[in-house]
């Protein structure tokens, strides 16, 4: 069975997790998969910038988790790559805003209700709460090292 929810992680910052997430997401989408890339690096989000979508962020992951926005409202469709969508992290909230059980529900909804074939989760660096939350719904992991 292939992993449908994959966390892209590392023990330290600056190794290329975000770049790997964006590029793998684009490659899978170009192969015909419907892909959601989810930025869980609350407070230090960058996946939207790497993908060129920073000007289109209205709602984010924390808005969804805290009930201020529906999941579909927060998803941003990449106009350059068909079948590629971004769920951005919050730029202002603290990592404590992430609840692992609620995040599992968001990933489940992406796969089961929104029909995504694959969810790639861009994890914050380290082994603290943010990275643990990012890994909670994952069925597989891609560990980026340098």
Task: Enumerate the predicted regions with their spans.
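Flexible glycine-/small-residue-rich
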Residues: 10, 39, 88-91, 123, ...
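A conditional alpha-helix N-cap/helix-loop micro-motif detector
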Residues: 18, 99-100, 124
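Inter-motif core of Ras-like GTPase G domains
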Residues: 128-146
């Amino acid at each position: 069975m292939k992993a449908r929810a994959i966390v892209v992680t590392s023990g330290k910052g600056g190794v290329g997790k975000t770049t790997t997430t964006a590029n793998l997401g684009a490659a899978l989408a170009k192969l015909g998969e419907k892909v959601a890339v989810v930025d869980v690096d609350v407070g230090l989000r960058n996946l939207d910038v790497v993908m060129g979508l920073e000007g289109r962020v209205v709602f984010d992951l924390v808005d969804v988790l805290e009930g201020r926005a529906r999941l579909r409202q927060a998803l941003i469709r990449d106009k350059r790559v068909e079948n590629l969508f971004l769920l951005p992290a919050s730029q202002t909230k603290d990592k404590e805003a992430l609840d692992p059980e609620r995040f599992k529900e968001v990933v489940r909804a992406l796969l089961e209700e929104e029909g995504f074939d694959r969810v790639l989760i861009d994890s914050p660096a380290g082994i603290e709460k943010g990275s643990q939350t990012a890994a909670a719904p994952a069925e597989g992991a891609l560990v980026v090292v340098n």
